[in-house]
Amino acid sequence: MSVNMDELKHQVMINQFVLTAGCAADQAKQLLQAAHWQFETALSAFFQETNIPYSHHHQMMCTPANTPATPPNFPDALTMFSRLKASESFHSGGSSGSPMATSATSPPPHFPHATGSFATPSWPTAASPPGGPQHLQPQPPLWTPAPPSPTSDWPPLAPQQATSEPRAHPAMEAER
């Protein structure tokens, strides 16, 4: 039961090449033989699809099975996500009169007294009056969303995007 050690090494290399590249065993053997059994050279030749002479000329190099045909295009994916609207999953007609749908597309409130990036709410800083907070006068809201209008000028559109697609949310653009 004497097994040629070189033949055994070659068979192991062929099997490893098949697992790594995802190609057929006969193609792996041809690539390894052409690269003088240098594994990395044969693997590089396989992924670069260089012209290596084959004994069967009708045989084409196969695409590796463990890689996608085309990698994902992340800017396109971000563009698609920016086109999504929160109201679309609940209302088929797009934007409705609900405050939630309107606040998603309305400009943020402007607080002239704010000094930082966050506005301080106008809550009383002193202790509650006797009897508890139920006797406080209701404060008028600082900002009320405007009703939706078909000719709304918010969000502003870039000139080249005015007819093709809506502009992404500013927070989404900051992450790009």
From Swiss-Prot:
Record's compositionally biased regions (Low complexity): 88-105, 120-137
Start and end residues of each stretch annotated as Disordered: 88-176
InterPro entries found in the cross-reference section: UBA-like_sf, UBA_8, UBALD1/2
Comp. bias intervals (Pro residues): 138-150
A Pfam family hit: UBA_8
Ranges of biased composition (kind: Basic and acidic residues): 166-176
Similarity comment: Belongs to the UBALD family.
Name of the protein in its database record: UBA-like domain-containing protein 1
Species the sequence originates in: Rattus norvegicus
